[in-house]
Amino acid sequence: LVEQTVARYGRIDVLVNNAGISMRAMFKDLELDVMRALMDTNYWGTVYCTKYALPWLLESKGSVVGVISTAGFVGLPARTGYSASKFAIRGFLNTLRIEHINDGLHVLVFAPGFTASNIRSAALTFDGTPQGDSPREEGKMMSAEKVAGILARAIDRRTRQKVLTFVAKLYLWLDVRFPKVSDRLAYKYMAREPDSPLK
């Protein structure tokens, strides 16, 4: 991927790590191969792409972006593998930013919240089979195009971290100040999903 990009364009200015798999299952029921698949795609995919693009990004003083989720800040029940992978991406990129603080590398951790996309229909169940239809109302979510526009502006401004939705910002604020309240609200919020594994 990196070689093809450089061969065609001669440089890399921005790497957006956006590939991801989600899940819906309680950890007690989850087959560990599902967790491994999530980490391989979400976390290791980010690590490998960043590793091989990094020399070019350092040369261009470019941007590395990790698209995470509210689940990368606050543990979401029935999303243990997904949350773990997004926490790992955030930790990796925050550390990378500090390592290259004097090199001109821009690192952005981007948390869009629920976005209208097919990630939920492809989400894995406890045994790794896709769940099928999304349990959420996609029409009420931010469009992928709107999210992409906000992301492009954050890259232009060389923003360090961007969290989009009010609900996500509220959870982050509560998690720091009132963590027990945050835990309870996260549980209730996820339990309201149709066919939630928490019921």
Predicted regions and their residues:
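Residue(s) in the substrate-gating loop at a strand-loop-helix junction
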Residues: S69
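Active-site loop immediately N-terminal to the catalytic Tyr-X3-Lys motif
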Residues: F27-K28, V74-G81
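Substrate-binding pocket helix/loop in short-chain dehydrogenase/reductase
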Residues: M26-F27, E31-R36
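SDR active-site lid
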Residues: N102-F166
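Conserved amphipathic alpha-helix within the SDR
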Residues: L1-G10
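Active-site helix of classical SDR
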Residues: T50, S85
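Active-site-adjacent segment of SDR/Rossmann-fold oxidoreductases
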Residues: G10, V74, T95-H106
